[in-house]
Amino acid sequence: MTIIKDIFEQSRDINRTIEKVITYGASQEHRLKSEISEYVVTESIEQQFNDLLLKMQTAMESGGENEVGVWVSGFYGSGKSSFTKYLGLAFDESITIDGVPFINHLKDRFHKQTTKSLLTTVAKRFPASVVLLDLASEMLAGATMADVS
């Protein structure tokens, strides 16, 4: 008789911790390794990465390197935080997991060679400083520190 546990990938502990919420501040190497290894890039997510990277490349090549800003929106739980966190970390050469640049771990999650190549090209040709800002958490932090009279 097959049990549910047998359906899952045998190389991973079914009782492992999987983060429910991806936060920008959690950047310890072991945590990033766990997060990125669990990250499932669907066809739609990969298309969004590809579209954004193409737009970034076009903007940079047309002289708009000082004008690139990105607003990511979506429903609760749709993957906005993981999408932006992993893209941002891919542009930071100092972020590594087991000595391997984070960008390589993200590329391993993609299925299409074109997306992998585009990420490599944009990251190398246009070095960037990435500021990850979670407006909701900033707003909540401000609300908890407000004076009450």
Segments the model singles out, each with a brief description of its role:
Residues M1-S78, K85-F91, D108, V130-L133:
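Walker A/P-loop-proximal flanking segment of P-loop NTPase domains
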Residues V40-S44, V70-F75, S82-S149:
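P-loop NTPase motor core
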